[in-house]
């Protein structure tokens, strides 16, 4: 059960809370997806939890429910070139800051352990296991990113993106060695740096 400390603090006053989380900091290829979510005041759904604790089927079900129920949500998709230009930490921070500055009415923004230079933003360690708004954002980000990678699997079936979603599994590294790197790869990541770029 999520403790929802800040929701319990602000909801009784009729004030909205925004949660922000990301998916895709670790993969070797594909985008980083950052999502924000503002759930209705006093919203309840005991199934919503940190996306990493949920099955793929459950995440997909909750994605549809959150999209339907949310007061507001938004996505930022950060492409590999931007990740390489800024580094993954600063690319994540930049996207979260932009989402936190939304003009949609909310009293405070909660992030999952990402400090942002904004007095209305609170970074919470393991926030996706503490706040329903962050947990909802984590589900939105994870499901959207997985679907993007499944789309790339159609374009590049030889890499097996549908299975590993771009993470550095043994199978994925073997496919990188066999086929080289396409434009989806993050060249600032060490496993990519040591492999030759495949030109198209």
Each language-model region and where it sits:
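RNase H-like, Mg2+-dependent phosphodiesterase core
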Residues: 1-200
